[in-house]
């Protein structure tokens, strides 16, 4: 996605870089469908999923949402499912390990928020093989939400090199989660999930007290640790 930024201010409805093809930035093919889809957030704010305002949510809202959005369709060999918040911290850590140079705060923030759309757009992490069946309108909605995130956190566009590094870390995290969390076998990971990366044996994350390697964290723990990393990076990037 070619990311762009605007000078929209808090409280203004953000129309994003997606083409404004109809009233309320709703595509003509959506004629007759609702023009608002509100979500009431923990902070009391409201987010319109069809025309997201970049300042509608708080950082705490986002952390809570990601801690309650689950990988692997919510299934797990553990007592708890794996949250996207924990996955995001894993990918960021793996990118830091793989990078020849230290990630800038903006690059690290982009990694941390790479799946943030999932928390804001209904709290669903759609498994990859299902995505092509959701249609162009869902892709358009996701692009609008990503544009709102880009504006809110001033995220830089991916370069070819940084995106390749990100995808490598994301696939490595997926392979490792598949083995240690979802209980796929190494053979199934390569042949059925078609992930070529070899799963890690050592969990790259610093483990919270009382947690084992690869064990999914409780939502409160995942939200707290994600929020701490998010706010640390925001303070270093100068994002609002």
Annotate each predicted stretch with a short phrase.
Residues 2-240:
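Metal-dependent phosphohydrolase cores
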């Amino acid at each position: 996605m070619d990311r762009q930024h605007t000078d929209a201010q808090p409280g203004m409805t953000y129309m994003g870089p997606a083409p404004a093809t109809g009233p309320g930035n709703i595509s003509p093919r959506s004629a007759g469908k609702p023009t608002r889809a509100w979500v009431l957030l923990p902070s009391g704010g409201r987010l319109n999923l069809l025309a997201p305002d970049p300042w509608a949510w708080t950082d705490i809202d986002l952390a809570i949402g990601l801690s309650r959005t689950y990988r692997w369709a919510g299934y797990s060999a553990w007592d708890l499912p794996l949250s996207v918040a924990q996955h995001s911290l894993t990918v960021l850590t793996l990118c830091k390990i793989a990078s020849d140079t230290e990630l800038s705060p903006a690059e690290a923030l982009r990694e941390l928020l790479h799946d943030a759309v999932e928390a804001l757009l209904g709290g669903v992490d759609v498994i990859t093989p299902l995505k092509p069946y959701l249609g162009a309108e869902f892709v358009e909605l996701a692009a609008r939400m990503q544009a709102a995130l880009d504006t809110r956190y001033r995220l830089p566009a991916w370069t070819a090199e940084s995106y390749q590094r990100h995808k490598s870390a994301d696939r490595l995290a997926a392979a490792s989660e598949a083995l240690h969390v979802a209980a796929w076998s190494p053979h199934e990971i390569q042949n059925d999930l078609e992930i070529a990366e070899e799963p890690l044996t050592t969990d790259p994350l610093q483990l919270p007290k009382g947690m084992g390697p690869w064990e999914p964290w409780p939502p409160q723990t995942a939200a707290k640790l994600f929020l701490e990393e998010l706010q640390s990076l925001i303070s270093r990037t100068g994002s609002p």
